Amino acid sequence: MSTQSEAALEAGLIATLRQMDYDYVQIVEEDNLYANFKRQLEIHNRKRLEEHGRTGFAAEEFEKILIYLEGGTRFEKAKKLRDLYPLDTADGQRIWVEFLNRQQWCQNEFQVSNQITVEGRKKCRYDVTILVNGLPLVQIELKRRGVELKQAYNQIQRYHKTSFHGLFDYIQLFVISNGVNTRYFANNPNSGYKFTFTWTDAVNHPFNELDKFAVFFLEKCTLGKIIGKYIVLHEGDKCLMVLRPYQFYAVEKILDRVQNSNDNGYIWHTTGAGKTLTSFKAAQLVSELDDVDKVMFVVDRHDLDTQTQSEYEAFESGAVDSTDNTDELVKRLQSNSKIIITTIQKLNAAVSKTWYSSKIDAIRHSRIVMIFDECHRSHFGDSHKKIMKFFDNAQIFGFTGTPIFTENAVDGHTTKEIFGNCLHKYLIKDAIADENVLGFLVEYYHGNEIVDNDNQARMEEIARFILNNFNKSTFDGEFDALFAVQSVPMLIRYYKIFKSLNPKIRIGAVFTYAANNSQDDEQTGMGTGQYAKESVGEADELQ
C-alpha cells in the first residue's frame, strides 16, 4: 500500500471540494466560527431579511439566535436545525430564521475549512469541516494511508469527551478515511464502529477511496439531501440515524416512480437489511409530496401491524396513524391522516363490505400510495384484486427479501406480475460483504431422485442424514441449529421419524408464519382446524 501523509490527504480533499464549488473559509478559532456563521446565516436568510427592510442581524439579535441554538441536548439541537426560529426584534417585528433548507436542499450555503482549533477539556484541531449555512454539519477525520481506519473513529470518540461543544454539537455526520477506505456515520456517540457505512453506487459498488467518496457523497446537492431528508431523528433512543446507501437508493427509486409515473414496483432487500427504516422513510417522504393524498403501509398480520406502529413511533412520534380495527381504518381514511398503517385483512374488509366502502367512496379515486411490507402470495388472491379495483388510482410498492419468480411460482403468479419491475436490489451477498448479516457455510447433500417433499422415504433419508452427522455439525449436542419445514403436519411427521430413529434426541418446535405463505394458511396448517384437531396432542410432546 502506498503511503500518503495526512496533510497531503487533507490538501487533496480540500482541492476536490473547491473544484465542486465549495467555498473555502479559513477559521482558526471559535470566534472566527461565530463571525462566519453570522455572515452565512444572513446570506441564507437574505429574502426574509429584505422583507423586513434589513440586510443583516443586529448584534443583540444574533446573540438571541446563539442563545437559542446553544441550549438543549444534541438530539434537541438536531431538531432545532430543522425548525424555523421566530426572532422577535426590538422594533416589534418577527423574522422566521431558517438554519437549513430541507425542501430545496441545493439552496444552502456550502463551505469547507480545516484545522479549526477548539478549546474544551483539551485543545483540539479538527481535520476538515464542512459548514452548511455557517454551521459545522459534517466533520471529516483523516489518517495517513496505511493507518487502521478505526483510529480515526476512536479520535472522534475522544473529541466527544474532550472538545465538541457549542456549534459543533450541530454536527450531523462524520466521515473517516485513510485514503483507501472511507466510511460515514451519524453523530451518535453510543452507536459503535459497526454503524459506520461505506457509500456505494445504486448497484452496491463501494466508493472506498476518499476521492471517489467525495465526488459522489459530498457533492453539494447529494449531501444537502442526505442531511435534510435521510437522517432520522429516532425519538425512542433520542439519537440520530443515517440511512445506508441501499436504503437511500431504494427510497429515491420509489420517490422517482411516484413523481414521474403511475407504474408500480418492488424493492428486493435481503432479510436483516433494515426494511422497516427504509419503508418508514419512503412513506414519510412520499407523504410530503403535494399530489399524494394518502400513504398506506400495509402489513399481513395484526401483530406486525402493532410492531410496525411501535417502530414507526420510535422513528418519529406521531408520524403515522394506526388502525386497531376496520372501523378505525375507515375513520382514518376519511380524515386528514397522511400515513396510515393497517393490515391487508382490514383493508379488504373496508372495500368489500358495503357498510364500510360507502363511507370511503369519496376517496376511491384519490392519489393513494400503498407500501406493502412483504410482496408474498397473499397479494396473489382475491383480496388484493378487490383492493386494487376499489382504489383504482392507487400506486403500489412492495418490499421483499424473497421475491417470487417463474422458477419458484407455485401457482403461476410472480412478484413482477403483481408489483411491476424491481426498483432496487440489495441481496444477501451484498449484506454479507457489508457485514450487515452473518455469513454462512453451504453444504450440499444430494439424496435420491424423489422430489416429493411429503414422500416418507425421502423424509426418513433426510432424518438419517441429520442424525449421522449430528455430532460433527453441533456443539456437544446443544440447541444450535434449525431444521425448517414447510408445515405443522410435516413437523409432526418428522418428529415421529426422529423419535423412532433415536428416542433420546431432544426436539423443540417453533411455529411461525412463513414469509411467502398463502393468506388462508393452507400451506402451514395453522389457519384451519386441521392442526388443532389432529396435531395438538402430538405437538405438546415437543415442548
Spell out what each predicted region is.
Residues 135-137, 168-172, 291-293, 338, ...:
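Short glycine-/polar-rich loops that comprise or flank the Walker A/P-loop
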Residues 146, 154-158, 186-195, 282-283, ...:
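Short secondary-structure boundary/capping segments
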Residues 149, 196, 345-451, 459:
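Signature of the SF2 helicase/ATPase Hel1-core->accessory helical subdomain module
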Residues 338, 453-543:
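Conserved C-terminal RecA-like helicase domain
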Residues 268-269, 293-301, 479-487:
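Conserved RecA-like ASCE P-loop NTPase motor core of nucleic-acid helicases/translocases
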Residues 2-294, 303-319, 335-339, 345, ...:
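ATP-dependent helicase/translocase motor core
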Residues 25-27, 266, 294-296, 309, ...:
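Conserved RecA-like helicase motor-core motifs
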Residues 173-185, 331, 486-489, 511-519:
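Short, conserved secondary-structure transition motifs
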